[in-house]
Amino acid sequence: YEKGFLQNIEYSIKYDMLHNFNNKLDVISLDGRISTGFKGNSEISITHDYDFVSYYLDKKYSNYASTRIGLNTSPIELLSFGSDISFGKDVAFNDENPELGKEFNFRATLSLQLNNNFSISNLFSFSRLKKVEINEFYYRGFINRLNTKYQFSKSLGIRLATEYNDFSESIFLQPLFEWTPNPFTIFYIGGNQILNKDDKYFVDRSQMFVKFQYLISL
């Protein structure tokens, strides 16, 4: 396939029977995966995970599955994109009385290398787990994170990370200055600012940090 649009096809099947530290059965599952590579440094994959049985907090869950479809591509050096969707059933681990729910997850990443010095990347992820019998959710929300980086030189650069978390209704900001004159010396100075929503207002929590590391070889 090397000269055509279709580059390669790979598949795998995995069977697991896992036990916990007390040597009790924890999970029996069967996973199947197929991936296809295309011209332009692109890949599409499909993964199916079937759990015959699993245990959580001494509770048994039987015969449930989930499917994940993924796409990754980097057709040119300055652009890369990745995305995956998963759906099926999963355990509501965060609930006081964990039951199986209907899950749906979506994730997308986009990275741009605008020039040798400046790059931008964005990550968006959405997750929800819906109760099977009624129209209610164990959880539902999204997180969006934007990272920017500018390199003045190989050793000197600045970064800025911004994130909005819909689950906690919070905003996270992190500016960072970094200096690495050689592989043995690292210097960071930056800060974290978290804005948490409290009723109608955002509560500000700020933190500054400095890190210096020098490796001495003996």
Predicted feature residues:
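Exposed, low-structure sequence patches enriched in small/polar residues
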Residues: 1-218
